[in-house]
């Protein structure tokens, strides 16, 4: 579902890169004709779609801040991968995660690794843009975000990318006339039938540690609900 939101954001804005987070972990849209209720399930918030200019370095720092909130630093294959709280996940509004899931952004438009053996601020390795060209840390890129994030929500632009909150508005080069949900509806109508596909453009590494750890942590967090898309 997150990758589908990325698809809509990139298609609508013509940005180079998009940032988006999971807005829930317990929503299912069944195959068949989509309803307006399904659209609210897919995107429940009244956010607009914005495009901002960020340097390659700011993009990496943004992602560092995001992943610092939801992965641990693994020192052995037996460690947890996901930052979890000590509350019962079934009764917790963050589904057992230590940080709010709506602040756990991933990126599309780039290919990158998240090395969970590294400490905070040193995990992200951006291998290339989606088209295979190299990301230049000194160059500016057009980045699609929702209006909550563009205003500094979650601190990923301010505490992560290091942009002064007073400067955020000046970084916005385009703001859509409709909510992001409206753009999702337009996208579905234009491209129906929709078969969302995963981008597989990023991964946790080293995979020989992270793959088993992810399975263990999913079971701890969600039990019989099975694996959960992130």
Where in the sequence are the language-model features?
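Catalytic centers of hydrolytic enzymes
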Residues: 1-230
């Amino acid at each position: 579902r997150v990758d589908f939101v990325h698809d809509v954001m990139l298609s609508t804005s013509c940005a180079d890169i998009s940032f988006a987070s999971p807005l829930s972990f317990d929503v299912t849209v069944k195959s068949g004709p989509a309803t307006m209720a399904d659209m609210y399930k897919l995107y429940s918030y009244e956010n607009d779609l914005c495009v901002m200019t960020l340097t390659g370095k700011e993009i990496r720092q943004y992602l560092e801040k995001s992943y610092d909130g939801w992965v641990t630093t693994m020192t052995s294959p037996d460690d947890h991968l996901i930052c979890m709280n000590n509350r019962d996940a079934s009764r917790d509004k963050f589904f057992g995660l230590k940080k709010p899931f709506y602040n756990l952004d991933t990126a599309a438009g780039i290919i990158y690794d998240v090395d969970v053996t590294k400490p905070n601020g040193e995990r992200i390795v951006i291998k290339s843009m989606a088209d295979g060209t190299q990301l230049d840390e000194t160059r500016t890129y057009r980045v699609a975000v929702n209006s909550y994030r563009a205003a500094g929500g979650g601190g990923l632009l301010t505490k992560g990318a290091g942009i002064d909150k007073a400067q955020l508005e000046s970084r916005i080069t385009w703001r859509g006339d409709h909510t992001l949900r409206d753009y999702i509806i337009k996208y579905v109508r234009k491209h129906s039938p929709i078969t969302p596909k995963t981008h597989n453009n990023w991964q946790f590494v080293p995979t020989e540690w992270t793959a088993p750890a992810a399975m263990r942590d999913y079971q701890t967090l969600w039990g019989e609900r099975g694996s959960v898309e992130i």
